[in-house]
């Protein structure tokens, strides 16, 4: 320590150099470091080489495989343990299955034995039943042979149950017609036709005699009850021919008791003529020829009974019709149609039934038929209802096809009224019937809205039987009233179109022409207003059809109108009634409805010039107000007192019948304005027609401004259409 300190002191002080020992030590340390480093590198190189060698790899694989082997061994052990457990479970299940199989096998054996026993028992029972059936069949055959032998030995005869598709007879009882009734006495054989099945059941019993006897006089009509044992079989009044098998009084009374007990009704059995079959031998009665004759006789007797019943019913109906009080012409016409159609429908039935009738029966029925026909003719001639001679056209109207062609209910009612008018006019025009008391009745329908108290005078006049004695004016009024019923809402209504409805419209047009001819024959002046009223029935919406309808009426009146227009110029039908107005003094009233086409040539030329105004005014409907109805009523009552001036009564617009209303169509509006234009044109020409028109303005003033103010329609256009134009 001294040295070090000295050294240290000497270095410090003397700054001496390091000694060689130091260097040697350092060199020695460095050498050792180099050697250790070389070793380290050698070891690393060897390790690397070793890792790269196969031995090392094999060792690594071996180690890995060894580890895997250990794992496999462990998993194998676990699997063995699990498999052992599974085996134990399988053994247990197998033990259970074997036990159940043994039980099922035992049950199978038991069931098989039971099935075998049941099969054996069923075979035994079927065999026994078959043996019993065979024995029963043998017994039935033996009984049938015995019964047939005894029946043939006794000589009994039962006719065939089915002949020509009809069951002729069968053994039946009284109550249900299924059991056999035995009686100590011989009875009669009933043959009752069933209307539903067209089969015939017979009631029979043992007959002690050796003969089967039929009498033609035993066919009677028995009144049967509606139900027998709760089943509807025979209706009341059904024809039931009765065939007798014996002729004693005891048998008749016994048959009467059977009929009264079975059917609960009265039966009047009467014996008729004895036929030659009473003395005929048995083998003749049982021959096929006699069987067919018996069937024919039965059918003829049934037809005789039905014919007699039909005739008696006809006689009763005729007596009831004669005793019945008169009804409305609608029902009267229907009754006449039915009475006229019945004789036409009955001759085929009589002809069909007469084919099976014997000569004696037909001759016996002829007096009764003649008497019946005479009674029917007397009842028809003495009937108080409307009776006419039926023609082919009327039969067409009566046929049901007319009702299907009419379309709706309103047109059917109008068709019925048309038929009544045609009947009345046909009876009036017929040359064979010279009776003047034609009955013209309006159908009294309580639900008709068009009838009112204003119709009473015309109806009373029309219902009068001696209408021709009242004068031509009343005659014309009645016919026009009847025609007005055909179009209560106006002829121009589209629902009331009749021109396209054939054959009713054609017949009506022809009858209208006959009516005009009848008016001429009674020296009644026919004027243009009547043509307008008659043509109102045929008004339609189209212009060409209106022209056709009025041209048919104009044909009969063309020549006479021109001749009488000059004669009766002082009583012109074109007078337009007017009343003094508050503003203009005189205002034209409601003009008369003229048909298109019944005008002069000058008027037709004037109407063509004003066609535009007419088309505008035609679209405005005309409505009949209450004031106008009251005006018509007062005018009608005033016109009845003016019998002398019949021409002006029929032509004045207020004297039209109450039933003829102003419709809401276009044709009447056109004629209204056309008359105004014609009147203005004729006044400028100075014709006699216009002169009397001016005279009528001063005398027949009936309308005023107050009347137009009372109108229900407040529309100015409607009032303008209703108010006539001033010339």
UniProtKB/Swiss-Prot annotation:
What gene does this protein come from? KIZ
**Lineage per the UniProt record:** Eukaryota, Metazoa, Chordata, Craniata, Vertebrata
Stretches of Basic and acidic residues bias are at 286-324, 343-359
Where is region (Disordered) located? Answer: 1-20, 176-226, 271-456, 564-727
What is known about its subunit structure? Answer: Interacts with AKAP9, CEP72, ODF2, PCNT and TUBGCP2.
Q: Does the keyword Secreted apply?
A: no
Q: Name one GO biological process term.
A: spindle organization
Q: Where is the composition biased (Acidic residues)?
A: 603-613
Where would you say this protein principally sits, based on its record?
Answer: cytoplasm
What is this protein for, i.e. what is its function?
Centrosomal protein required for establishing a robust mitotic centrosome architecture that can endure the forces that converge on the centrosomes during spindle formation. Required for stabilizing the expanded pericentriolar material around the centriole.
Q: List the InterPro entries.
A: Centrosomal_kizuma (IPR026742)
Q: Which residues form a coiled coil?
A: 77-124
Q: Where are the transmembrane segments?
A: none
Annotated Low complexity bias: 380-390, 569-583, 659-669, 677-689
- Spell out the protein name for this chain: Centrosomal protein kizuna
